[in-house]
Amino acid sequence: MFLVLVVCVALLAALDLALYPCTFMRNDVHAVVTQQFDDIIVGTSHGKMDINPDVMEEVTGRSGHNLCVGGEYGIDAYYLVKLIKEKQNPKRIIYEVDPGYFVSEKEEGNNYLLFYHEFPISKAKVEYFWNSIAKCNFRTVLFPWYEYSLSYELPKVKDTFTQKVSGDYDVSHLKSDSQEYHESGFIERYPVDVTKLKKSEPKLYEEGQVNEENMEYLKKLIAYRKENDIEFVAVTTPIPINTLKDYSDNYNAAWKYFGQFFEEQGVEYLNFNTEYFKTFTHDLKAYTDYDGHMNGDAAEAYSKVLAQVLDSVGQKN
């Protein structure tokens, strides 16, 4: 019986090694557990495509890594920060806030494992598993690669296996026709013809529909940074003016809710759609979609603005 168990475990490990893809989160987690950074940026896809730590460092003199990704909820950010604190001593957490993520639930699928799968053995990983992953469909836990299309992964088995075994984290593997991943964790999207963009409804904040678990983990993260003397700044990146106008009621309600929340928590909240609206363009030409994901040139310009605002806020405090 024991031998059968050992064989099963070995087989699952081999399948995981060969079939689970090398994602950019693999590079991200490897970077933050093996290097020291002053700033850690967590949040959603807006943060991933809009905030370039290398550009910010040119202004602030502070090193940073971008751990944002689409599908990253409060629980993910919380355990990512706990993992980082086990391995290094960040000076500041920059939390990119997308209001829509606080009225929706984390969906099962490959994003559920995107972060956890890359965690090294640690206290944070055990806690993360117990409070999040253990609630998944058992297939997600035992067969993490099943969430990915085998027709896509099978032709890449050799490359995937080689990258993992050799410890290859070359960012060129993560480049596509539409974007490229940088060592800083930033993803640069290439410019698009905005005249051909189609509107799609973004994740919208709905008054009275806040998911309490999501807010609870945000509160836990704020409390954790206080316990560990880590600076904390919340940021909402610019959204195209077309989208702000189309869903003005939703966004106005969101700005009011989060403005009040962060004020009560004693957290600096930099909202580039209200107080800092005029510091950066909301023209659709700077973006790659109506949701607000910037192209690389715009992200570089915005990152400079964000860094300058962060510096000015720091001087005031």
Positions of PLM-derived features:
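Alpha-helical transmembrane signal-anchor/signal-peptide segments
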Residues: Y20-D38
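Membrane-embedded segments
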Residues: H46-I133
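Residue-level recognition of beta-strand->loop/alpha-helix junctions
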Residues: C68, T236, N271-N273
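Secreted/periplasmic serine-hydrolase-like ester/acetyl group-modifying domain
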Residues: Y112-N228
